[in-house]
Amino acid sequence: MPHLSSASRQRLDGAHPLLRELFLAVADKAAIEVLESQRGRSAQERAFALGHSRAHFGQSAHNWSPAIALDVVPAPLDWTDLPRFRALAALVKDEAKLRRIPLVWGGDWARLKDMPHYELDPWRRFALEARLVDG
C-alpha cells in the first residue's frame, strides 16, 4: 500500500478517479506529498491575486469536483531542488503513459512553470462530467 500522509490521502480522495489511480501508483515508487486538489472560489481568487495562478474561479482544473488537477511534490519538499521535481514528473508521465491516462505537467508550460501541477488533458472535457467546488 502506498505511503501517503493523511492530509495527502484526503486531498487525493477529492481527485478524479484517474488521478487517484495514477498517484497511488506513483506513491508506491516515490515519496510524494499532495499539496492541493480541489480549490474553492476564495482560494482560487487568492491564488490569482498572489500570482500563483493565471485563472479566476471556474477557469482552473482545481475548481471542480472531482478535482481534475493535483499539485504534487517530491517529499520531503524543497522548492529549490528542481531536479527532484523533474525526476518526479518523469515518473508520473511514465506511469500515465503506461496507464493511458491523458496528462499535462505544469512544468512543461511555456509561460508560467508550475512544477507541482498535473492535470488531466484536456481538462475542460473532464469538467463536463464534474461540478464546480462550493466555497
What are the residue ranges of the model-derived segments?
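Generic alpha-helix detector with strongest preference for long hydrophobic helices that associate
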Residues: 3-7, 53, 73
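Short, well-structured alpha-helical interface segments that form or flank functional binding sites
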Residues: 17, 21, 42, 87
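Extended, low-complexity, intrinsically disordered C-terminal regulatory tails
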Residues: 23-52, 98, 104-106
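Catalytic cores and adjacent binding grooves of peptidoglycan-active enzymes
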Residues: 55-135
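Short amphipathic alpha-helical surface micro-motifs
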Residues: 15-17, 51-55, 100
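Active-site acidic/histidine clusters and adjacent loop/turn architecture
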Residues: 1-33
